[in-house]
């Protein structure tokens, strides 16, 4: 039997199964930033908050009024860990004080300068901004996968950047050819 690398879910989407009852993850689509022997880290990308970039900028640079377009840039709940910490997924190309290039032509930036750049019209134009992240201890995500808590879907930048937040979960499921309303809550193991 071929051994699967423990990082096999990095740069994939996790689709919460319909029977997921954890309020932090029920009906979520999560982008997996990292998955290795030490655990996993991801960002929920379909949970918009009532908070906007304008609200965040009011806290970060209160001396400057936020540009009007910032009222239309929604902040998402990225997960239950460190909910005061910001993360921005965006296409690769621009780098900021704290930017990590990820597979598939996307980057993750965590410094305030990315927010200022978006606000000031210098981009990145395509972005998903989250507060908080989802974290799993070593083996925890693997165990949840074995318990059928999640489906996995290969990454598609169109789902991340071109699909409205409230449609991302269904778009990822459609990519697999699945209607989440028709999935059984019971599964067997051969």
Swiss-Prot record:
Instruction: List residues traversing the bilayer.
Output: none
For this protein, the record's NCBIfam families field holds:
PRK00228.1-1
Cellular component (GO) terms are: cytosol
Query: What family is reported?
Result: Belongs to the UPF0301 (AlgH) family.
Q: Which Pfam families match?
A: DUF179
Q: InterPro entries given for it?
A: AlgH-like
User: Which HAMAP family would you find in this protein's record?
Assistant: UPF0301
Q: What highest taxon heads this organism's lineage?
A: Bacteria
UniProt-recorded name of the protein? UPF0301 protein Psyr_0485
